[in-house]
Amino acid sequence: MKTLQRFAYLTWTGIAAIVLAAVAPAQSRQAPTPNPALLVLSKQDHALAIVDPASLHVVARVPVGDDPHEVVASTDGHTAYVSNYGFGAFHTISVVDLLAQQPEPQIDLGPLHGPHGLAFVRGRVWFTAEAAKVIGSVDSGSRAVNWIMGTGQNRTHMIYVFPDAQEILTTNVNSATVTIFEHTDHPAGMQRPPQGGPNWQGAGLPPPGPRGQGGPPPGPPGGDWNETVIPVGGGSEGFDVTPDGKQAWVANAWDGTISVIDIAAKKVTATLQANARGANRLKFTPDGSRALVSAGPEVIVFDVATQKEVKRLRIGHGGGGGIQMQPDGRRAYVAFAQDGFVAVIDLRTLEVVGKIDAGGNPDGMAWALQQ
């Protein structure tokens, strides 16, 4: 009887161990984090894969919570931040120590639901929060939200922050728009009202200051932001800014076009009939000469100067997602969710030269360069 009981106990503990292993987030470590490292999110595995771009092998997998969509690395390459999207249900940003290859406590965004697009600029994690219709930033030191700005647009999805953090662009999918935010010390449209008496302060406006002092009233501490909303094509989602900062190209998934925006003029200067329905992401090469678009099973390559298609590669069966360019400009990496791999494209020959198994349903990617 004791033998049977012991066998039953061992059998049950063995089954329990197998079940727990099956449901627990995958975490493994095979080698130190390379420099640079390609970071790839697996939505299915709820994990961040750390990839060695030299060997195209995954050196570690780190759990990052439910529904991870986008990832960005800190400037020093030591930390990764991952948006837990949930189509508006979630409100966290997961954090990974890339050197230790371990998860850290999540950042809770409170009522700012649906975090998606990410950028890391000047020590801050900038994010979109779709369900809250805002963009915001988190101080990477305190890991607390330190700035929020409403967009008034539907599904503010992706974000680009200029290196000086004085200008921000977002795509707003369901509004079919792009928003340009510009930091200013003097908000547009604020003019000093006429004074009605010695103690008149205006209706809900800042105090006009000493009598006889000209100019507009002072803005809020730290300045303000001017917002320009630019109509583009339907389903505006993936976009990028040229390396010189002059243009933004926006992939419009619903009508398959690409909108070219003059950022200084704040207007669309060209609409390319790209035949890119379902376009998910768009990325420029580091030298700015070409733009790559992921659209379903295809990657479409454009010459930026001529705005003409150069080549169309059919790679997967569908679900083309995140795109990243190797920092030296030699390769592009494109995630194909339905196929479960990341395609590696030689940017000189425009041919697929490898594939990375980064986990099920790969999508968001980023580079981590250790400093």
Locations of the language-model features?
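Predominantly soluble domains enriched in secretory-pathway, periplasmic, or organellar proteins
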Residues: 10-14, 18-371
